[in-house]
Amino acid sequence: MTSATTAPHTTQTLQFHPRVAESVATQRGEGWSIQAVQELLDLPFMELLWRAQATHRTHWPQGDIELATLLSVKTGGCPENCGYCPQSAEFDTGVKAEKLMNVQEVTQAAQAAKDAGATRFCMGAAWRAPKDRDIEKISELITAVKDLGLQTCATLGMLQSHQAQALKDAGLDYYNHNLDTAPEYYSDVVSTRQYQDRLDTLRHVRDAGINVCCGGIVGMGEAPVHRAGLIAQLANLNPYPESVPINSLVRVAGTPLADSEPVDPLDFVRVIAVARITMPKARVRLSAGRQQLGDAVQALCFLAGANSIFYGDKLLVTGNPDVEADTQLLAKLGLKGTPNQTTTETACGA
C-alpha cells in the first residue's frame, strides 16, 4: 500500500518596490517587512485590537476624530482605467463629465462643511495629471478655502515638481495620492499608469513641503499578502504619510470591479489596526465604503485606531453616511471631533 505524497507548502513572498526599498535602507532600524506586517494581520483578533488600541492611546491620548469633507470640484471624464473608479471615461457608470467648479461654488460648499464641524476640506478633480493652467485655477480655490479657516487638501492626479510647489505656495496643507494596493497586484487594478508614477508624485509633494495623504483600497480581489504589501509600502515611506485613508471598495455597476467579493468586515478592521500599529503618528482615516460597514464595524475601527472620517453625504460620486448619522454615531460612542485649527502637522517619523 502506497501513501500519497503531499506537495510542500510554499509561501508567496513580495519584494519592496525599488523606490521604497531605497527609502527603507535610509531610515532608522530595519523598517517593516511584509512578513512582519502579515504576522500582525494574522494575530488573534482581540490581541490585535489590544495592541492597536495601546498604540493609539500612546500617540493620540486626546482621542479626537478628525472630520474631513471631500468635494468633487471636477467630476468625470478621467482617461485612466482604474478598475474601481466610476469617474473613468472607459466605463459606462452613468457619471457625466463636468467642468471645474468656480470659486463661489467651492467656497459655499466649504463654508457649509465648516459649519457642520469639518476641519479639513479636500478638493478632488478627475484628471490623470493637471495642466499648469489647471493648477492656477485650483490654487485660487485653495486660497479661498484657506481663508475660511479650514485645512486644505487636494487630489488631482499625478504632479510635476513645479506644480507641487505652486500648490504649496497657494497654501495647500495636504495632497492625496493613494498607492491603492501592493505593487504586485497593481496591474490587476489599473494599467494606464505605473506604480512608480504614484511614488514620483508623492516625492514631489514631500519635496515641496506639503503633508502627504496616502492610503489604499481593501476588497478589490487582492490576497491577504497584498494587503500586507500595501501597508508595508506605506509604513516604509520616509517619512510615512501624515494621513492614511483606508477605503473599503464601493462596488459601482459598470466598473470592472463591480462584482468583487465584499471584504470580510473583521478583515477590514484588521487592516485599520495594523495601519495604526505601523504608522502610529498618522491620522488613519475611514474613507470610502463606510456606509456599507454599519455602526458596529465602524466602532471597532475606531477602537482599532481610526481617528479620522470623511464627513458628508457624498464622497466624490459615491454615497457616504449623512452628517446627522455621523453626529449620532460619534455621540453614541462618546467621541468628539477635532477642534478647528489650520496649522499643519509635522512629518511623521518612520
Swiss-Prot record:
Transmembrane spans: none
Cystines in this chain: none
Cofactor details (free text): Binds 1 [4Fe-4S] cluster. The cluster is coordinated with 3 cysteines and an exchangeable S-adenosyl-L-methionine. Binds 1 [2Fe-2S] cluster. The cluster is coordinated with 3 cysteines and 1 arginine.
Residue ranges of every copy of the Radical SAM core domain listed in the record: 63-281
Binding site for [4Fe-4S] cluster: 78, 82, 85
UniProt-annotated binding residues for [2Fe-2S] cluster: 122, 153, 213, 285
EC number(s) given by UniProt: 2.8.1.6
Biological processes per GO annotation: biotin biosynthetic process
Pfam families, sorted: BATS (PF06968), Radical_SAM (PF04055)
Enzyme class: transferase
Function: Catalyzes the conversion of dethiobiotin (DTB) to biotin by the insertion of a sulfur atom into dethiobiotin via a radical-based mechanism.
Protein name: Biotin synthase
Lineage: Bacteria, Pseudomonadati, Pseudomonadota, Betaproteobacteria, Burkholderiales
Gene name in the database record: bioB
